[in-house]
Amino acid sequence: MYIPDSYLDELIASDIPSGIDLTTHVLGIGAQPGRMEYYTRDAALLCGTEEAARIFGRFGCTVAEALPSGSMLAPGDVFMTVEGPAAGLHMGWKICLNIFEYYCALATKARQMVDAVHAVNPLCEVLSTRKLMPGTKPFDVKALTLGGAFPHRLGLSETVLVFDHHLTFYGG
């Protein structure tokens, strides 16, 4: 699933509204070259490396190595290595860490649920609802589908689903 640049730009703007990491700027270390690795503490289903690479690219960093979303990780596995100026590494670090922490966990839990359901009935599927935190849908859907679950309904425009409150206006 492709997550639009505009969505990633919103994540960046919400974390770095002024466009600089003030601490790195004040310390005068922004131009120093660096290397950073992301690794996991627990077994997990990876989600978000493609988007993290695009975020770091906006800050002048390059991805030296990265596993693709959907990879199974064991504790201690390094799944992404990024190189670039300290300013870029610091600006991308926390945004991407939050993506990894939340959406690897969601993908992993979805996978566990799908595996548990399929152990009982391989023909049964796990479906997600539209009850998502506002603004999180792109990553939620990506993580859930990586975990093997399916979105029941992505939006109001794709299917007809009549609730009691619709019937109130319909006359019955």
Task: Tell what function each PLM region has.
Residues 1-172:
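Acidic/glycine-rich phosphate/pyrophosphate-binding loops and surrounding catalytic core
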